[in-house]
Amino acid sequence: MDHDSYSDGYLRDILEGVRTIAVVGASPRRERPSHGVMAYLQRHGYRAIPVNPNAAGDRINGETCYGALAEVPEPIDMVDVFRRSAAAGDAVDQAIVVGAKIVWMQLGVRDDAAAARAEAVGLKVVMNRCPAIEIPRLGLPPR
């Protein structure tokens, strides 16, 4: 897959097909982009579950934060990665292990080797994009 360009149809299929999104790197700090994007996803009807080992057990946007994807007690459709590119591979590998269907790496986050590992086992991958930008750009209504 060409990760420099995604068709609107590809992004739309992903965003219309997912329900539960684990936000890896979610922050309890309101000024952090991960906090705002998680809240945006919730307002649009997605179940957004925070994952951050530094905030495990805390509540972020009304949801319990988990220390790792494997601790989330329900199936995860998509993993939204708010980590530096150098740390994204670990989140992708965890997404593979827990059976997520999609890995979405946020703006500025790209790991081609991790993307290849995910795609090799059937996951869809998006890199260097933000769902909170793509949802309104595509005209997707709240769920």
Regions found by a protein language model. Give the residues of each.
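Glycine-rich, highly charged phosphate/nucleotide-binding loops
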Residues: 1-7, 58-74, 80-89
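Alpha-helix C-terminal capping/helix-to-coil transition sites in glycosyltransferase folds
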Residues: 17, 74-78, 99
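NAD(P)-binding Rossmann-fold cofactor-contacting core
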Residues: 29-32, 39-59
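General beta-strand structural signal in soluble alpha/beta enzymes
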Residues: 50-51, 105, 125-128
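Short acidic, glycine/proline-enriched helix-loop-strand junctions
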Residues: 74, 111-135
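ADP-ribose/adenylate-binding Rossmann-like module
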Residues: 95-118
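A charged, well-structured terminal subsegment
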Residues: 134-143
